[in-house]
């Protein structure tokens, strides 16, 4: 594959961020050394933007949520990012929050990415998880449950849009009595306010 054809394949994609493995698949390339050389050429000539080892963007205007989901896999966007996007909290933490298999903080292009550890049985369960615009994100109900599971005391501003039945139906995947209590307390508090 010529240099220009390889770049054109990337530029035609609806994705803005690519892992090295995704580029290999996109190009149908089996020679990793050759692919790495092409990618390095694109980076040196400013045609690809390096984000992190093995992760590249078309340019500096990449989708940050898409990048977030490629840093650690498996992971999904949740917690305060989803709560703020859905209007459940008014204070938005400027971090992009995800859950994954380890707790980490990462900074790239002046954007903080915060990863919170959650047990594998929850992380790999697809209930309330949505594939959206080249990234994976929790529904507002799943984000509420993740937050109640990970944080002992958390203040929510507006729970009017929550489907409580979905929350109670999904809560079993956490297998956690403290979460069950926090969910019930949060529901009771909302119901009587």
Which residues does each predicted region cover?
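Short beta-edge/loop segments at beta->alpha junctions of small alpha/beta modules
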Residues: 1-74
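Nucleic-acid-binding surface
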Residues: 59-193
């Amino acid at each position: 594959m010529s240099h220009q054809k390889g770049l054109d394949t990337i530029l035609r994609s609806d994705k803005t961020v690519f892992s090295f493995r995704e580029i290999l698949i996109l190009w149908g390339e089996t020679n990793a050394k050759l692919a790495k050389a092409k990618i390095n050429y694109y980076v040196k000539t400013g045609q690809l933007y390096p984000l992190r080892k093995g992760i590249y963007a078309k340019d500096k205007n990449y989708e940050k949520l898409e990048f977030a989901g490629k840093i650690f896999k498996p992971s999904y966007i949740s917690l305060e990012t989803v709560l703020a996007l859905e209007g459940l909290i008014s204070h938005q933490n400027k971090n992009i929050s995800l859950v994954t298999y380890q707790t980490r903080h990462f900074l790239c292009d002046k954007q903080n990415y915060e990863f919170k550890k959650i047990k594998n049985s929850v992380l790999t369960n697809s209930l309330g998880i949505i594939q959206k615009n080249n990234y994976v994100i929790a529904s507002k109900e799943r984000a509420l449950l993740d937050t109640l599971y990970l944080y002992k005391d958390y203040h929510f501003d507006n729970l009017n849009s929550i489907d409580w039945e979905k929350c109670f139906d999904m809560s079993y995947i956490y297998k956690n009595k403290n979460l069950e209590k926090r969910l019930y307390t949060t529901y009771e508090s909302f119901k009587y306010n």
